[in-house]
Each structure stands twice: as structure tokens, then as C-alpha cells.
Design a protein with these regions (language model features):
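Surface-exposed, low-hydrophobicity beta-strand/loop segments enriched in small/polar/acidic residues
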Residues: 1-192
């Protein structure tokens, strides 16, 4: 039972795309040298007008291009190519590349910050933004369970519940499967 709060951000698990096959494919998108915010595995990221990605810090609205699942850069300390689950804030390197699951139809596992009943299925929710874990390199973002509503501008929609030995509908910190509801940058008619 999900009786302990252990949010891990958005974990891409599947897709609603016509192919029906989730491959975990990522797009490589640059991060600006010296960008001042850490980005953790499972954080939402957005494109900005410099042609790079930044952490999307929205809660009731997001404009995501996808989910950050790691990065690569030449370490300014060692001079070695570094692969990491986390982008360390203010890293100065000219070759920083984020790995982003950018499928607008991706399904993601997330934990709620409170219990969600079966009646939450099909409704929309906001995001709770929290600083990531530097010890494990994971996002600590969660679904805002108190925001469940039909509001069409909320960024995520509950598609399913994670049902298993450690998770069930209505648990104190319910694990859910969500999709982007509104705001994905590939669906917007205006540019960045």
C-alpha cells in the first residue's frame, strides 16, 4: 500500500500513440550553459525561445515539451563526457544535451500527495512542484490530489490507477497513470 509519500516525478511507462508501442525513445535537446536550475529525472521540461529546454515549474498550467530522463555534458571539472540522471544547476559546458521523452501521448506514473478515490479516474489534476532528490537524482514532483476537477486547463489527466502489492486505489498517497491534458508544446498552435 502506498502509505508513505515517495513521489518520484513523472515516470514514462506507455503511450496512447497509434503505434501502441512505447519504446522509451528520447529526443536530444540542448540545455543552455550555466542554466541556473537543477533538473531531475522525472521533471517536466519546456522549450524556451533560445532553442533550449528548461525545467517547467508550472503547477496548475504547464507548457511541457516532455519529461527529462537524463543528460550528457563535458564536465567542467574533469573534462570527461558525463552522463547523468540530473542536470546540476549552473553547469558551464557548451555541449549539454537533455534526454527528453517528448511524445505528447506518453503515459506517466506519478504519486499523488494524498488519497485519490476511484471517482478521480478521467479527471484533470495539477502538479505539486518540489525540489528533487540530489542523493538519488530523481524528481520529487507529485500529482496534486486536492486539485481533481474537470477544468480543461489543468495540465494532467488521470488515465488509470497503479494496482498491485504496494499500491491500490484510495491509498494515502495513490499512485496514478497520467497523460498531458493541456499545454504540450507540440500541440500549441503558436511557437515558443
Amino acid at each position: 500500500m502506498a502509505t508513505t509519500a515517495t513521489p518520484m516525478g513523472a515516470e514514462p511507462t506507455d503511450t496512447l500513440s497509434a503505434s501502441g508501442s512505447f519504446t522509451g525513445k528520447v529526443r536530444h535537446i540542448k540545455v543552455a550553459s550555466g542554466y541556473g536550475t537543477a533538473i531531475f529525472y522525472g521533471d517536466f521540461v519546456k522549450l524556451v525561445n533560445t532553442g533550449t529546454v528548461e525545467k517547467d515549474t508550472g503547477t496548475t498550467t504547464l507548457t511541457p515539451v516532455g519529461v527529462f530522463v537524463g543528460c550528457a555534458f563535458t564536465s567542467p571539472t574533469t573534462g570527461e563526457l558525463t552522463f547523468s540522471q540530473t542536470f546540476p544547476a549552473s553547469t558551464a559546458a557548451s555541449d549539454i544535451v537533455a534526454y527528453v521523452v517528448d511524445d505528447p501521448n506518453v503515459l506517466m506514473r506519478m504519486q499523488s500527495d494524498e488519497a485519490i478515490a476511484q471517482t478521480g479516474l478521467g479527471n484533470n489534476v495539477a502538479v505539486v512542484q518540489t525540489a528533487g532528490s540530489t542523493s538519488i537524482g530523481r524528481s520529487k514532483n507529485a500529482v496534486d490530489g486536492s486539485s481533481i476537477n474537470t477544468t480543461n486547463t489543468l495540465p494532467l489527466r488521470i488515465i488509470d490507477f497503479v494496482d498491485g502489492p504496494n499500491s491500490a486505489v484510495g491509498d494515502a498517497f495513490t499512485d496514478v497513470i497520467v497523460k498531458f491534458n493541456a499545454g504540450h508544446q507540440y500541440s500549441n498552435t503558436t511557437g515558443v
